[in-house]
Amino acid sequence: MKKFKKLIIACDGESASGKSTAARLISKKYRLILLNSGLLYRYASKLLIKNKPRDPISFLNSKFKKVTYRNISNQNLHSQQISDHVALLAKNKEIRKIVNNFQKKIIKDNKKICVEGRDIASKILAKKPKYDIAFYFKCNLDVASYRRWIDIKKKVSLNDVKKSLRKRTAMDRTRKFSPLIKVKDAILIQTDKLNKKQVLSKMCKHIDKIN
């Protein structure tokens, strides 16, 4: 395994495509800070669902100034209610700005980091600092739905999970601000055809080629 003094990795992909697991594994392998942008939007959704503020933007702006990423990452943010809500929230330009600013502060302070989300290579790490390598994750809808269904401990029907994932990906791809896209130089990882070990191995082969 090659050692790096600086390494910035962008991991983008569809819902339940395995990007979070892959980002976690690769971060551990290369001793990188892991930043999951999806958790930030889920945290925002949880706050809005729970508090129902009159002015959501000011409310979230205040909350994100006080919270740490560690605190957010330790919360349970994967309920189906949050999953259904977060796609709508992620379309809001002002909310995206709040989340993006939070991410950029963390990225600025870390030379070795893996950032995972939906607009990382195309927006967050598109320039200064730009990613050293980008990955894009895809997964067959049936496989992705089953994996998410297991993750949420079968609390809703498999069919409902499938509908939710299909809707979320469609919304991510067609939203006006920072839509989900694969940048030209991103390496495609089709996770339904690979196990965790194979995904990690494939990523490592590409990372170790970086000069």
Give the predicted meaning of each segment:
Residues 128-151, 162-166:
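Conserved phosphate-donor/acceptor-positioning beta-strand/loop module used by diverse small-molecule
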Residues 2-4, 77, 101, 146-154, ...:
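NTP-dependent small-molecule kinase module
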Residues 27-37, 50-53:
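Post-Walker A helix-loop "phosphate-sensing" segment adjacent to the P-loop in P-loop NTPases
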Residues 14-17:
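ATP-binding Walker
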Residues 20:
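Walker A/P-loop
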Residues 39-113, 119, 124, 142-146, ...:
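ATP-dependent small-molecule kinase phosphotransfer cores
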Residues 9-11:
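Hydrophobic anchor at the beta1->P-loop junction of P-loop NTPases
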